[in-house]
């Protein structure tokens, strides 16, 4: 087939990574899974990270789910984004786990969110449920860094959410907080609790939280670059 073989060495530079991603455009997940000898799950409910893991095998990513970027040598994070027939995102995009304790003195400039979003390789993937997983195709890639306006919106939301966490209001935060960035529970089950700060400054147990990009933000980003 015309696409890359799986498990290449890590890309040497941004251009090589982007060219690998371009070669995947138009391929189906079934073709790529067969080439990588990976079993295709029945659906993505229990295997949310499967598409990203599959693409990492063809792009040469090494970081896995560590806090660093997927391509740490290049400072690039890989984000797959399921889209509908009109090219609009079907779900929010996970950025990273939110720190709920030990946040004194933390700033936007040194935050995990900013680090993860400094340079992103976006790869759209057909995501409508009526398309069987194996038949869903990969779209054209996009290498992106936030412009000044996007960075300002992200910083403002991050600071607002982190202030609420530090002040002990984590349980009051809903997915409606934030213009482009939201904070919501991230746990496979409701028994996986983590320590946080309560309203009186006392330690409490709560669900782990994650930062997510809202669909309005990623939708505008894709539309601007692809003229969707």
Curated annotation (Swiss-Prot):
InterPro entries the UniProt entry points to: DNA_mismatch_repair_MutH, DNA_rep_MutH/RE_typeII_Sau3AI, DNA_rep_MutH/T2_RE_sf, Restrct_endonuc-II-like
Cellular location(s): Cytoplasm
Highest taxon of source: Bacteria
The entry's keywords: Cytoplasm, DNA damage, DNA repair, Endonuclease, Hydrolase, Nuclease
DNA repair in keyword set: yes
UniProt-recorded Gene Ontology molecular function terms: DNA binding; endonuclease activity
Signal peptide coordinates: none
Record's GO cellular component terms: cytoplasm
Family statement drawn from the similarity comment of this UniProt entry: Belongs to the MutH family.
NCBIfam families for the chain: mutH_TIGR (TIGR02248), PRK05070.1 (NF003458)
Protein name: DNA mismatch repair protein MutH
């Amino acid at each position: 087939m015309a696409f890359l073989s799986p498990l290449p060495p890590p890309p040497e530079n941004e251009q090589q990574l982007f060219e690998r991603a371009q070669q995947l455009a138009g391929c189906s997940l079934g073709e790529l899974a067969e080439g990588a000898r990976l079993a295709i799950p029945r659906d993505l409910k229990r295997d949310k990270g499967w598409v990203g893991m599959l693409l990492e095998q063809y792009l040469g990513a090494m970081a896995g789910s560590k806090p660093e970027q997927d391509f740490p040598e290049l400072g690039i994070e890989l984000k797959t984004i399921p889209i509908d027939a009109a090219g609009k995102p079907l779900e929010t995009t996970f950025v990273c786990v939110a720190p709920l304790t030990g946040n004194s003195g933390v700033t936007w400039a040194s935050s995990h969110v900013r680090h993860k979003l400094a340079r992103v390789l976006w790869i759209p993937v057909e995501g409508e449920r009526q398309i069987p997983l194996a038949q869903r195709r990969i779209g054209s890639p996009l290498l992106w860094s936030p412009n000044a306006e996007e960075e300002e919106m992200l910083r403002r939301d991050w600071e607002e959410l982190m202030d609420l966490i530090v002040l002990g209001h984590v349980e009051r935060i809903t997915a409606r907080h934030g213009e482009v960035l939201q904070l919501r529970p991230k746990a496979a089950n409701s028994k996986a609790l983590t320590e946080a700060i309560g309203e009186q400054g006392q330690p409490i147990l709560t669900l782990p939280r994650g930062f997510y990009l809202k669909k309005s933000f990623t939708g505008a980003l894709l539309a601007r670059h692809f003229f969707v």
